[in-house]
Amino acid sequence: MGIRDFVVSAPQLEEVCPEGLRPEETVCHISRQKSGAVSAREDDIVITADTMVFLDGKRLGKPRDEADALRMLTALQGRHHTVCTGVTVRQGQRMLTRAQSTQVWFRSASTEELKAYIRSGEPMDKAGAYGVQGLGALLVERIDGDFFNVMGLPVLLLSRMLAEFGVTLL
């Protein structure tokens, strides 16, 4: 993306959210929590994000095991769901948080196809049990919105947020 001289840090925190938040509020809340858990020098720019999959307003996290992955993928069959990402950019005391939502439609797939996908191992560390950037793309019929959001980081939104901090990528 044109960013040089950076460090990747995975903050260790328990993602806790108040009940009753809308999907966009939920991912923004967790993104801000992650930002607060990362220490930085005053002039450093910290970027954090959190992506979640929502089906019928309910969060689909990462599958606990293969049976859970099959349950999630079966529930997504022939339907659409929402992928939300909260992005936070922080420099010193200044912090900006925004959300991006994308609608994703899954095609109908056979149980055998879903089990083969699960055996690949790809779904096991992904919210909603699929990765659109890999074999999971074969389950997706249509995307309405930012493709990169479904991957976990809406790059256009991030570039616009960085521009507000004086960082341009092009």
Residue ranges of predicted features:
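Short, acidic/turn-prone active-site loops that include or flank metal/cofactor-
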Residues: 10-16
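Anionic-ligand binding patches
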Residues: 21-170
